């Protein structure tokens, strides 16, 4: 049986994630106390013909400090039962979480009389750090809406259904902030910028004219070759450690031209040469 533990900060999209997993065929339970998790798994595996081969459980801070402190032991017990267990952790910037709570008027699970929302968020972040550091996949939803998050989770989880690494190439613009849900971040702002060509300014790195412009510069090919060789060298090492997910982020100034172009080229290369499960996400084009 495959089990995904869905955790993260309140307001970061855990319910959206569980809904997406349910649509993908997972049996989902939200807000399960950590102390009940092992028994829950045993029940799912008890029948001679198990009813559920895919399950997902939402776990939040309400499990309490004692159970959170024993998270590693709980996960070890589950894996000892032969379960393929993965951890999905969602986060978002504090100002975005505050805005979401203001818009939805939902109450934070740690909110107590006299405790400001910002303090509840910071306490939650501290308590859930025990889970966050063990996450197989971390998604930053700061700049992601409900529909984008749904598609992103479906893509990553379905791709990780086999033994192959699920590899995401993500473009972004540094002026909008660096993504924190990355395994590698590469700065490509040193490359020639199509933005300064009036005919290319409104286009993106997906457009042939932008690609042709960048292909004219030898330094762009050199950058691609260097990134390709680096990833070819080190991806097998991550696979050897049984990693299910990897996110490679490439950033230029605005996230429209150079980073998009390189993300697409690298994704095409690794799809063709290694047969990996590869997807792309262009944060600023969303």
Swiss-Prot record:
Displays ATPase and GTPase activities. GO terms for molecular function: ATP binding; GTP binding. The keyword Transferase does not apply. Keywords: ATP-binding, GTP-binding, Nucleotide-binding. Pfam families: PapZ_C, RapZ-like_N. The keyword Iron does not apply. This is Nucleotide-binding protein Tgr7_0722. Belongs to the RapZ-like family. Signal peptide: none annotated. It comes from the Bacteria. GTP binds at residues 60-63. Coiled coil: none annotated. ATP binds at residues 8-15.
């Amino acid at each position: 049986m495959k089990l995904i533990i869905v955790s993260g900060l309140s307001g970061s999209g855990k319910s959206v994630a569980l809904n997406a997993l349910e649509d993908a065929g997972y049996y989902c339970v939200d807000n399960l106390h950590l102390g009940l998790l092992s028994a829950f798994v045993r029940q799912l595996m008890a029948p001679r013909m198990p009813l559920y081969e895919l399950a997902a459980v939402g776990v939040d801070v309400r499990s309490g400090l004692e159970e959170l402190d024993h998270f590693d032991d709980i996960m070890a017990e589950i894996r000892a039962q032969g379960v393929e267990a993965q951890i999905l952790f969602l986060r978002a910037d504090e100002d975005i979480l505050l805005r979401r709570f203001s818009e939805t008027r939902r109450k934070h699970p740690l909110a107590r009389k006299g405790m400001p929302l910002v303090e509840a968020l910071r306490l939650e972040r501290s308590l859930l750090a025990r889970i966050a550091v063990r996450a197989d996949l971390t998604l930053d939803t700061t700049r992601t809406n409900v529909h984008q998050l749904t598609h992103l989770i479906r893509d990553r989880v379905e791709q990780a259904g086999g033994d192959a690494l699920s590899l995401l190439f993500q473009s972004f613009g540094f002026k909008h902030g660096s993504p924190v849900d990355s395994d590698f971040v590469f700065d490509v702002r040193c490359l020639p910028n199509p933005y300064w060509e009036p005919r290319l300014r409104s286009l993106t790195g997906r457009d042939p004219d932008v690609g042709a412009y960048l292909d004219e510069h030898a330094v762009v090919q050199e950058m691609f070759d260097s990134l390709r060789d680096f990833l070819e060298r080190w991806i097998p090492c991550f696979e050897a450690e049984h990693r299910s997910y990897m996110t490679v982020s490439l950033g230029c100034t605005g996230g429209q031209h150079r980073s998009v172009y390189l993300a697409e080229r690298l994704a095409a290369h690794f799809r063709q040469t290694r047969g990996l499960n590869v997807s792309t996400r262009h944060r600023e084009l969303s």
